[in-house]
Amino acid sequence: MAMIRSAGLHGFRALVAELGGDAGDIAVRSGLPTAALESNQMLVSDAAVAVALETAAHELSCPDFGLRMARRQDLNLLGPLGLAVKHSESLATALRYVSDFLFVHAEGLRIWAVPDPLGSPDVAGVEFDAGPGRVPTPQSTALVLGFAHRAAVELVGGPYGLRSVELPHDPPDPEAYAAYFQGPVRGGRASAVIRITGSLASLLLREHDEELQRLAGAMLARHRRNPADDVVQQVRTALSHAMGQAPLTLGAVARQMSVHPRTLQRLLASAGTSFAEVLDDLRRHNARQLLVGTDLPIAQVAQRVGYAEAATFTRRAHAWWGTTPMRVRHGAQLS
């Protein structure tokens, strides 16, 4: 179970009350202590937070609940991380701080820069992932992406070149989402990504302060990520580089990382996962991205994610999505 600081619930009680609900009741039924609604520093289950957001959205008939929560939160909730982000030189530097130190506030969440999932060379992507083997819920995704969007506008001092927002699910309220992001919002995608025109490094921040950035960075450097979590990311990176080009085996990755295979197995187990789970999660992610974002033949998609035969890939697709790769692609095109 991944933990998250209760700052992620900031504004929950007030918003639920405005909508005519009982925040304490929803919290308890979702597995959260009511004290978490009054503090920004408690560690609570991220799964329970996700349940609370979905419950509130459903019971209060508020499909854009996550976006409304995002409007009530700002970078000050992130402490030293917020300071480092705010006083960075560019959006690229700010995003690196988030990628490296978001674990201080949310163990499982990952946000990082990626190439454009639709393949445009002049577009950058900022991707949100709930972690290996975890599927982000619509309201949690809205809260994270909504927060990131508002922060980017504040940091840059205006529009930052948002091209589109890609979601792994249909937007619960298309009009509200389009109005919030001031751009196209599309569902049925491989992952949650904000697409941005141009280079993130070229987007300079209006409150850049080298000394404050250095001091905030020094405070963040005192925090140490769980070594096992680092191993998961290292394995994922090694597999990404080898996928479709080299054997995707525990032994091959262990050799690349200069550790014994059994040691690597133990480290992954201590992170609550396994080599097979990390590989399967990466294959699923990459396969959906290729199906949705390209027109590569199915056999070539299979090869790109490490399957020698399209039939094997198709069987695995049924396990992931309950349907065939072609139907995944067709469904995305219709969305």
Please name every model-derived segment.
Residues 170-335:
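Extended mid-to-C-terminal alpha-helical interaction segments
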Residues 7, 21, 143, 230, ...:
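Conserved active-site and cofactor/substrate-binding residues in soluble primary-metabolism enzymes
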Residues 76-200:
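N-terminal regulatory/effector-sensing and dimerization cores
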Residues 29-33, 168, 281:
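Short acidic/histidine-centered micro-motifs embedded in hydrophobic/aromatic stretches
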Residues 1-123:
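N-terminal low-complexity or simple alpha-helical regulatory segments
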Residues 53, 145-148, 220, 239:
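Hydrophobic alpha-helical core bundles mediating ligand binding, dimerization, or RNAP-core interactions
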Residues 11, 143-147, 286:
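Short amphipathic alpha-helical face segments that pack within enzyme cores
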